[in-house]
Amino acid sequence: MAATDVRPKITMACQVCKHRNYITRKNRRNDPDRLELRKFCPNCRTHTEHRETR
C-alpha cells in the first residue's frame, strides 16, 4: 500500500560526498521526476546539490 502513496518519504543524498542527510516527503503528481535541491551538507560543511535517492 505504501508503494502507491501520493506523498512518499524520500531521502536526499549529497552529490559530492554521497551522504544521505535529509528525509522529506514529496508529491508525486506535482514532481514525478527526481527532486534536486541545494541544501547544507554537514559532512562537506557547505551548500551542495542534493538529489532524491530511492
Swiss-Prot record:
Coiled coil: none annotated. GO terms for biological process: translation. One of its GO terms (molecular function) is structural constituent of ribosome. GO terms for cellular component: cytoplasm; ribonucleoprotein complex; ribosome. PROSITE patterns: RIBOSOMAL_L33. Pfam families: Ribosomal_L33. Belongs to the bacterial ribosomal protein bL33 family. This is Large ribosomal subunit protein bL33. It comes from Parafrankia sp. (strain EAN1pec).
